[in-house]
């Protein structure tokens, strides 16, 4: 099965400016992400960036690069520009890997593409089980709730589902007994290329603005998203300088 990986790589990150070029074990971070994408078996890997320095570095290690606008409000808008510029066919499967995921397992890149191909949906993603109560109550850990067949009912930063008997008068998070219903969403997506173009035509919704989760726009507009349990749990992504040091330590130990 053929699929294309697009890696958005913004230079002007508010929390860690220039992070695509941050050195990790002698390579820029974006090169680590690119190499993981290649290992997934993708037929094509494209780095989408709004920065000439990132583009030059990416070309130096052999990556295909697509220059994009600096004015996009979301990563999905950047994907849509790439799809349009490169005339990618509407039925092509596109996997979106963030440019700050140097430790992403190649197996789950392939898995999310296979997930989309197996089901009659235009968008697919992955999740992992939540075993830690602190993670469950952490708003930075996005929760996802699905039906019995893996189709998404909702994404939220809140605890879903809400266990009324346990949580109503909860005083000690450590005493929570978690059921199998709790899933953390992993921010890797597969889409049909034509659907990406459709998505950016929809106006932002109240739900996504409240939760700050753009995937809610898809559900609001009546489209389905299928989620599977990831075959491998991805390690930390890089949002901050502290995250960068963690990733450096992990790779230095290997």
From Swiss-Prot:
It is found in: Cytoplasm. GO terms for cellular component: cytosol. Pathway: Nucleotide-sugar biosynthesis; CMP-3-deoxy-D-manno-octulosonate biosynthesis; CMP-3-deoxy-D-manno-octulosonate from 3-deoxy-D-manno-octulosonate and CTP: step 1/1; Bacterial outer membrane biogenesis; lipopolysaccharide biosynthesis. Pfam families: CTP_transf_3. It catalyses: 3-deoxy-alpha-D-manno-oct-2-ulosonate + CTP = CMP-3-deoxy-beta-D-manno-octulosonate + diphosphate. Its EC number is 2.7.7.38. It is an enzyme of class 2 (transferase). Its main location: cytoplasm. Activates KDO (a required 8-carbon sugar) for incorporation into bacterial lipopolysaccharide in Gram-negative bacteria. Belongs to the KdsB family. HAMAP family: KdsB. This is 3-deoxy-manno-octulosonate cytidylyltransferase. It comes from Haemophilus influenzae (strain ATCC 51907 / DSM 11121 / KW20 / Rd). The gene is kdsB.
């Amino acid at each position: 099965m053929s699929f294309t990986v697009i890696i958005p790589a913004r230079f002007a990150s508010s929390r860690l400016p220039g992070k695509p070029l941050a050195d990790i074990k002698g390579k820029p971070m974006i090169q680590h992400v690119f190499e993981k994408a290649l290992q997934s078996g993708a037929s094509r890997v494209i780095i989408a960036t709004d920065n000439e320095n990132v583009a030059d570095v990416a070309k130096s290690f052999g990556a295909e690069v697509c220059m994009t606008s600096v004015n996009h409000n979301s990563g999905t808008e950047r994907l849509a520009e790439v799809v349009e510029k490169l005339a990618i066919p509407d039925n092509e499967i596109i996997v979106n890997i963030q440019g700050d995921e140097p430790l992403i397992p190649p197996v789950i890149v392939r898995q999310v593409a296979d997930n989309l191909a197996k089901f009659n949906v235009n968008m697919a993603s992955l999740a992992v089980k939540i075993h830690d109560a602190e993670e469950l109550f952490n708003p930075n850990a996005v929760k996802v709730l699905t039906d019995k067949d893996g189709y998404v009912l909702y994404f939220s930063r809140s605890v879903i589902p809400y266990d009324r008997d346990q949580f109503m008068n909860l005083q000690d998070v450590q005493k929570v007994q978690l059921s199998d219903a709790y899933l953390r969403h992993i921010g890797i997506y597969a889409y049909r290329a034509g659907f990406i173009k459709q998505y950016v035509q929809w106006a932002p919704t109240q739900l996504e603005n409240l939760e700050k989760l753009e995937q809610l726009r898809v559900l609001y507009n009546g489209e389905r998203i299928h989620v599977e349990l990831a075959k491998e749990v991805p390690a930390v992504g890089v949002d901050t300088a502290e995250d960068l040091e963690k990733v450096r330590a992990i790779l230095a130990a290997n």
